[in-house]
Structure formats: structure tokens, C-alpha cells
Amino acid sequence: MANSAQARKRARQAVKQRAHNASLRSALRTAIKKIIKAVEAGDKTAAQSVFNENVSVIDRIADKKIIHKNKAARHKSRLSAAIKALA
């Protein structure tokens, strides 16, 4: 339990920040799912355009340190490889 005024304020800020980070993580998951759905549809050009639109979301969330930059790079690499594997 936060006893000092400073600790109470930091606790309030942590709650708000946690909610904000959760919304950003949700946006990341949605962007990744959109790309996967486009890949599973089998249309390479559509999948590539969806990838190009959503890769900035992945990068932005990594820049804000919501996820590690290597995790963002791993997602982008695997999704890009899946698109390239389409015939």
C-alpha cells in the first residue's frame, strides 16, 4: 500500500500507464492478425500491402518499448517470410 503522497501518485500513474500499454499491445496483436489473415487468404499482393501498412504499427510499439525491438524484428521477419513463400 502506498503511504506517501508521492507513492500514491506513482500508483495512480502506473494504473493509467498499464491501461495505455495494454491498448498498444492489443493494437499490435490486431495488426499481426490482419497480416496473418491476408497471408492465409493466399493473395500475395494483398498480403504485401497489408504488411506494408501494419509494419509501422509494429515498429512504433517497439520504439515505445512496449515490446522488445528484437521481438518486433522477429515478427516482421516471420511475416515477411510467410508472404514471400506465397506463390
UniProtKB/Swiss-Prot annotation:
Residues 7-19 have a biased composition (Basic residues). The keyword rRNA-binding applies. GO terms for molecular function: small ribosomal subunit rRNA binding; structural constituent of ribosome. One of its GO terms (biological process) is translation. GO terms for cellular component: cytosol; small ribosomal subunit. Residues 1-22 are annotated as: Disordered. It comes from the Bacteria. Belongs to the bacterial ribosomal protein bS20 family. This is Small ribosomal subunit protein bS20. It comes from Methylobacillus flagellatus (strain ATCC 51484 / DSM 6875 / VKM B-1610 / KT).
